[in-house]
Amino acid sequence: MKLVTRMWSILIVFFLAVLQPAQAEVRIVIDEGVDSARPIAVVPFKWNGPGSAPADIADIIAADLRHSGKFNPIPVNRMPQHPTSVSEVNPEAWAALGIDAVVVGHVTPANGSFNIAYQLVDTIGATGTAGTVLTQNQYTVTAKWLRYGAHTVSDEVFEKLTGIRGAFRTRIAYIVQKHGGSQPYEVRVSDYDGFNQFVVNRSAQPLMSPAWSHDGKKLAYVSFENKKSQLVVQDLGSGARKVVASFNGHNGAPAFSPDGSRLAFASSKDGVLNIYVMNLGSGQISQLTSGTGNNTEPSWSPDGQTIVFTSDRSGSPQVYQMSASGGGASLVSTGGRSYSGQMTADGSAIIMISRDNIVKKDLASGSTEVLSSTFLDENPSISPNGIMIIYSSTQGLGKVLQLVSADGRFKARLPGNDGQVKFPAWSPYLTK
């Protein structure tokens, strides 16, 4: 089938838009947690064309599964055989290595495009018979969509083996503060793994806090380009920008509602920093918080009914939650400095910063778990399937992006090499 027919227009405009490519990309560097993950084999895909293959599809798939923290693809040199279809798979040879699933496939040139075909094979008979195909598919893509095609395979394999939707076709937005230059501040977007990076906006003045719209077509962020803080919403397809909030005082921390109709943000327009919600259709604004304390960093629950936010009303920053329509707030965090709260996709937990590390609080039991061990962690953002958390931390004299799994076992870095990288925001799903 044609993979392009399954893409939303947002994915096409990422490449067609008049946005500027970035010179240096971030890449995932794994620190710990893979060795204890589930072993799997992704056999090199057979290339059915002349010369060398235009991309190593199997390597991309293996990297995706490894980055999830749930799988540990074995090295090619440890593979007992190199099958390219289910008929060539020897289940016993793989089962002897503790491998219960094998991905095989091939890539074939097709009239200027490329056909990617794969099969996921059960090697231990978990579904009844060893050697059974668990799932299979094929896609025809152009050269620039080869990585996307590989990510599609990864998503399908991941979901089949875990029951959780894959998030390898998502993107991240972040801020880079470059070393020198007349416009050192940049809003950038890349694939979740750092590839295909481009610049959304450059500025001589600070840029902060990018946030995705529900459909992935727009970014909201804070800009100081007019010598004051203002909230900007930018269309990623056309590049068109609109200032939606430029009140006196500070305007910051934008967050789109799950349905995209509202934008929560913080503003000190009346002297104290409070949470407001803007109806993006009418422009009408309602104030959610009040009192003498500062309230900021709003984020939405998955159902759009609750706002999680940070407030110093008790004397130190703590995480609270309240109804998105207003009313009283309840304390989520306890003890120490806590901020940057965000609810997980299933609504069962809140991820936040507590004592400068990433912490997960289970809302049912009240138990907390420290997930990170890095230094001065900030701005956590959760993948749409809830498996991974991206955040920024201090490394040396600068800021870098970090990844940690929601169970705290897998850890990785996305170091930048042309400036400080901060304020990461994980996109929603970009496919149907």
Curated annotation (Swiss-Prot):
**Keywords for this entry?**
Cell cycle, Cell division, Periplasm, Signal
Compartments annotated for it: namely: Periplasm
Asked whether the UniProt record includes Magnesium among its keywords, one would answer no
Q: What is its main location?
A: periplasm
Q: Which InterPro entries match?
A: 6-blade_b-propeller_TolB-like (IPR011042), PD40 (IPR011659), Tol-Pal_TolB (IPR014167), TolB_N (IPR007195)
Q: Where is the signal peptide?
A: 1-24
Mind telling me which GO cellular component terms the entry cites?
A: periplasmic space
Entry-linked Pfam families: PD40 (PF07676), TolB_N (PF04052)
Q: What's one GO BP annotation on this UniProt entry?
A: protein import
Task: Report quaternary structure and partners.
Answer: The Tol-Pal system is composed of five core proteins: the inner membrane proteins TolA, TolQ and TolR, the periplasmic protein TolB and the outer membrane protein Pal. They form a network linking the inner and outer membranes and the peptidoglycan layer.
Summarize the protein's role.
Part of the Tol-Pal system, which plays a role in outer membrane invagination during cell division and is important for maintaining outer membrane integrity.
Q: What's this protein's family per the entry?
A: Belongs to the TolB family.
* Name of the protein described by the UniProt record: Tol-Pal system protein TolB
